[in-house]
Design a protein with these regions (language model features):
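Glycine-rich, acidic
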Residues: 35-188, 192
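Short beta-strand/strand-turn micro-motif
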Residues: 1-6, 93-97, 104-106, 110, ...
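Short beta-strand-to-loop capping motifs
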Residues: 21-23, 58, 111-113, 201, ...
């Protein structure tokens, strides 16, 4: 009844699907899918991890940059949020997905690994006057906690039900059977012990929450911080964590242990940065 993994799925053709999951879990996901494959050979499955690369283009000028490096149409009307298309970047074939993990307008560019240097150079050359800069996984983590985006292995886990992790809108027990439904229904009858919240951590001058830190209320452990970082767009230290459902209220005061020091923390609304998703669903008028 928990969350085993998370996938982005692109339908490439009538009977061909391209699946993307967390790189660190590729072996686990590969074996799990194989275990559910029909035994009659009607479905073929291939692990492309070692032959594919991914570059992420994100930010308010992402569309302008993509139009410079491709002849395909990246307008909002033609390339809507949460859609995917096969495009060309330079002379490289690319599966472009209008999704990203940072809460800004952007695309994931999935490509044969042998084209990666070509695509990277093409992007960097075309984006010089736009202020384009490379960024790494720690910067991405900072951006994702500002949006309350959930990470497999921390906020999403077999340890927590999808209801506890805030995935209610994706779970429909009455629409037909799915893997884990029976276990999830039993879990619902028993009741849930946790609820995912976003917190502002106060007075963190030299350290932010990294994860697996106890959360306290009146001296008692009432939850666990699953992840965190300093949010530079918000100018605040942000943490995600599981707490007892009765404490999961906006404005609730708690404490988090960071490196042996107690820090005051306040529960915020989910997705404290760009709550309206304006940047994610940006139209051309948002580009500047």
């Amino acid at each position: 009844g928990g969350v085993h993994s998370e996938f982005t799925i692109m339908r490439e053709s009538e009977n061909s699907f391209y699946l993307v999951s967390a790189g660190a879990f590729q072996r686990l996901d590969h074996d799990w899918i194989l275990g559910w494959m029909p035994k009659d050979g009607s479905v073929q499955f291939e692990n492309l991890t070692n032959s594919k690369g991914v570059l992420v283009v994100s930010g308010p000028k992402a569309r302008e940059l993509m139009q410079r490096v491709s002849n395909d149409d990246f307008s909002n009307e033609n390339f809507k949020w949460l859609s995917a298309k096969q495009v060309d970047v330079g002379f490289a074939p690319v599966n472009a997905m209008r999704v990203n993990f940072v809460g800004e307008l952007g695309w994931e560019l999935h490509h044969p690994i042998e084209y990666q240097n070509h695509i990277f150079d093409k992007l960097m050359d075309a984006g010089q006057d736009l202020g384009l800069k490379p960024y790494g996984i720690r910067a991405m983590n900072s951006l994702r906690v500002e949006k309350s985006y959930k990470l497999v292995g921390t906020e999403l886990s077999i340890e927590y039900s999808p209801y506890e992790s805030g995935l209610d809108r994706f779970v429909h027990p009455n629409k037909g059977s799915f893997i884990g439904l029976e276990a999830l229904n039993k879990w619902r009858e028993k009741g849930f012990d946790n609820k995912l919240v976003t917190l502002e951590v106060h007075e963190t001058s030299d350290a932010d929450v990294l994860g697996n830190k106890p959360i306290y209320e009146n001296g008692s452990v009432v939850g666990r911080a699953t992840g965190g970082d300093f949010g530079f767009r918000l100018g605040k230290s942000i943490a995600l964590g599981m707490v007892k459902p009765e404490l999961a209220n906006i404005g609730q005061k708690l404490k988090i242990d960071i490196l042996g020091k107690m820090h005051e923390a306040t529960i915020l609304e989910e997705s404290p940065y760009a709550v309206s998703y304006t940047h994610l669903r940006a139209h051309e008028t948002r580009i500047h």
